[in-house]
Amino acid sequence: MNQTLLSSFGTPFERVELALDALREGRGVMVLDDEDRENEGDMIFPAETMTVEQMALTIRHGSGIVCLCITEDRRKQLDLPMMVENNTSAYGTGFTVTIEAAEGVTTGVSAADRVTTVRAAIKDGAKPSDLNRPGHVFPLRAQAGGVLTRGGHTEATIDLMTLAGFKPAGVLCELTNDDGTMARAPECIAFAGQHNMAVVTIEDLVAYRQAHERKAS
């Protein structure tokens, strides 16, 4: 990742800490991966605190594929089958079947309905019958071990939520440009500045976790 673009957001470790602060303050975070991977920026929000306004922003400026990142334990708790048995996508993204809250929604498409679905999936004691399938929210199963196992936005989201003190569940959506093309780092950074979001890279998070795990050992 071009460090010059990111310099105004501090050092890699400072960027992670600022991202955690943003999440705790109820703000979003822009998570960038490497130029040689997807080369995309994802808007992420804690599943516990995401507002209807934030969901509307995500739908308006994102790809439209609003995803709920969850752990394998939560996937099993909700009895959500993986979308396919043989995942042949380029990066092995762990989509499950799509979901909708069983109660409290209309068509499931609106920002409010999608927030209701997210809350239904992550609440304490959530059970399979709390969700209908299919729906308009796309759960993503994160790999155990987070970004140290797989350097994806899904794992980064779970790691950031955990480090910030939230349940291991977060909402993400890829940022797109107004013409429908994918936003790259310069556009993602500009958007984050306009919407008071912190910016962090997956590379930053890997280094941060590695350093803290070395200290712990």
Swiss-Prot record:
Site (Essential for catalytic activity): 136, 174
GO BP terms in the entry: riboflavin biosynthetic process
InterPro entries listed in its UniProt record: DHBP_synth_RibB-like_a/b_dom, DHBP_synthase_RibB
Superkingdom assignment: Bacteria
Catalytic activity: D-ribulose 5-phosphate = (2S)-2-hydroxy-3-oxobutyl phosphate + formate + H(+)
Binding residues for D-ribulose 5-phosphate: 37-38, 42, 150-154, 174
Binding positions for Mg(2+) 2 per the UniProt entry: 38, 153
GO molecular function terms attached to this record: 3,4-dihydroxy-2-butanone-4-phosphate synthase activity; magnesium ion binding; manganese ion binding
Cofactor note (record): Binds 2 divalent metal cations per subunit. Magnesium or manganese.
An example Gene Ontology CC term for this record: cytosol
Gene3D superfamilies xref list: DHBP synthase
Presence of keyword Manganese: yes
Pathway the protein contributes to: Cofactor biosynthesis; riboflavin biosynthesis; 2-hydroxy-3-oxobutyl phosphate from D-ribulose 5-phosphate: step 1/1
EC number from the UniProt entry: 4.1.99.12
Cofactor: Mg(2+); Mn(2+)
Residues at which Mg(2+) 1 binds: 38
Pfam families xrefs: DHBP_synthase
Keyword annotations: Lyase, Magnesium, Manganese, Metal-binding, Riboflavin biosynthesis
Subunit structure and binding partners: Homodimer.
Family listed: Belongs to the DHBP synthase family.
Protein purpose: Catalyzes the conversion of D-ribulose 5-phosphate to formate and 3,4-dihydroxy-2-butanone 4-phosphate.
Protein name (database record): 3,4-dihydroxy-2-butanone 4-phosphate synthase
Native organism: Salmonella typhimurium (strain LT2 / SGSC1412 / ATCC 700720)
High-level lineage: Bacteria, Pseudomonadati, Pseudomonadota, Gammaproteobacteria, Enterobacterales
